C-alpha cells in the first residue's frame, strides 16, 4: 500500500470558525491514520491553540506551528526539532517602532508563549491570550529577552505600514505580509494587520522536513490550505489542494482545488475519494 503524508492548515481549511471542527473531518482523519497514512497539522497557531484538534483527531505525529517557525513532535524525542526566530535586537527594534508610532496592539510569539500589549484584540488573539502558556505583558522597554518566532502588528496608518515594511525588508532576513480587513470597534481601528517572521519559517519547508522524517516523497504528499502562508506547501506537494473559494485558489500554484469549501468539508471529501477510495 502506498503511504501518503496528509498535511493541512487549520483555520479556513478544516476549521470554518475558530473552535468549530466537523465530525466528518475528524472521522476521515482517523480513518486515514487507521489505513496507515501520516496525518499532520501545519498551522499559524501555536501548539496550545492547536492541541484540541490534535487530540480530537487522535494524532501522534509531528506538527508544524507558527507558520513553520516551530516543527516538532510532542511525544517523540527522535524527531529533529526545528525552531527559528527573529533576532532579539530586530524584535525589539520592530516593537520600538510600533510604540513610537502608536501602532497597537502588537504581539510576539515563541512556542506557546505570547507577549502582548493593550489594545483591541480580535477574536483570534482573544482566544490566543486565553490559551497562551505563559502569557506575558509586553515589557516597557520592548525587550522580551529572546527573539520572536512571529510578530503581529496593527499599524496605525498605511504610511506607517509602508515605513515598517521598508525597515523589515531592508534586513534581508525577514518576511513581511500585510493584509486588510474592515475596521470596527471590536477588531481594530486601521484595518491593517501585518505578520513579520524569519524567512526560514515556511510551511513548504515544514512539509519537507516532516516528509523526510517519515520517509515519504513529496509526490506522495497531500497538502491542503487556504491562505498566503500555505502557498509553499501547496506548490511543492504532489497533491497540493487549495480550498475552494479561498485566496489560495486565486493566487497560489496549487495543482488542484477542492470540490467543496472548508465549511463543506472540502478536505475530508478529497481524502475520502482519493486516498480511502470511498465512492461519492
Where are the regions that the model predicts?
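Mg2+-dependent phosphoryl-transfer enzymes with acidic/Ser/Thr/Gly-rich catalytic loops
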Residues: 1-5, 22, 193-280
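Conserved acidic, metal-coordinating active-site core of Asp-based
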Residues: 105, 109-224, 230
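Surface-exposed amphipathic alpha-helices with a cationic face
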Residues: 26-34, 99, 169, 208-212, ...
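Non-catalytic pre-domain segments flanking phosphatase-related domains
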Residues: 1-8, 27, 34
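Active-site phosphate-binding/coordination module
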Residues: 22-128
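Short active-site oxyanion
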Residues: 36-40, 60-61, 149-150, 219-220, ...
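Short, structured coil segments at secondary-structure junctions
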Residues: 57-59, 67, 171-172, 236-237, ...
Amino acid at each position: 500500500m502506498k503511504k501518503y503524508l496528509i498535511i493541512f492548515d487549520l483555520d479556513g481549511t478544516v476549521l470554518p470558525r475558530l473552535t468549530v471542527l466537523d465530525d466528518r473531518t475528524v472521522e476521515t482523519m482517523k480513518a486515514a491514520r487507521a489505513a496507515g497514512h501520516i496525518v499532520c497539522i501545519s498551522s499559524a497557531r501555536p501548539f496550545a491553540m492547536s492541541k484540541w484538534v490534535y487530540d480530537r483527531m487522535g494524532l501522534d505525529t509531528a506538527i508544524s506551528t507558527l507558520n513553520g517557525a516551530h516543527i516538532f513532535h510532542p511525544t517523540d524525542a527522535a524527531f529533529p526539532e526545528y525552531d527559528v526566530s527573529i533576532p532579539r535586537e530586530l524584535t525589539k527594534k520592530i516593537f520600538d517602532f510600533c510604540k513610537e508610532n502608536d501602532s497597537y496592539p502588537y504581539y510576539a510569539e515563541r512556542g506557546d508563549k505570547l507577549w502582548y500589549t493593550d489594545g483591541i484584540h480580535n477574536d483570534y488573539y482573544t482566544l490566543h491570550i486565553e490559551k497562551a502558556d505563559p502569557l506575558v505583558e509586553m515589557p516597557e522597554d520592548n525587550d522580551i529577552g529572546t527573539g520572536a518566532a512571529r510578530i503581529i502588528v496593527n499599524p496605525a496608518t498605511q504610511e506607517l505600514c509602508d515605513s515598517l515594511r521598508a525597515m523589515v525588508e531592508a534586513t534581508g532576513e525577514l518576511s513581511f505580509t500585510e493584509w486588510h480587513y474592515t475596521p470596527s470597534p471590536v477588531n481594530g481601528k486601521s484595518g491593517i494587520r501585518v505578520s513579520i517572521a524569519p524567512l526560514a519559517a515556511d510551511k513548504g519547508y515544514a512539509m519537507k522536513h516532516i516528509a523526510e522524517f517519515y520517509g515519504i516523497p513529496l509526490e506522495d504528499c497531500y497538502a491542503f490550505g487556504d491562505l498566503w502562508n500555505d502557498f509553499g506547501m501547496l506548490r511543492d506537494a504532489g497533491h497540493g489542494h487549495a480550498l475552494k473559494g479561498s485566496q489560495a485558489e486565486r493566487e497560489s500554484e496549487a495543482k488542484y482545488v477542492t470540490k467543496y469549501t472548508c465549511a463543506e468539508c472540502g478536505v475530508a471529501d478529497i481524502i475520502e475519494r482519493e486516498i480511502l477510495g470511498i465512492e461519492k
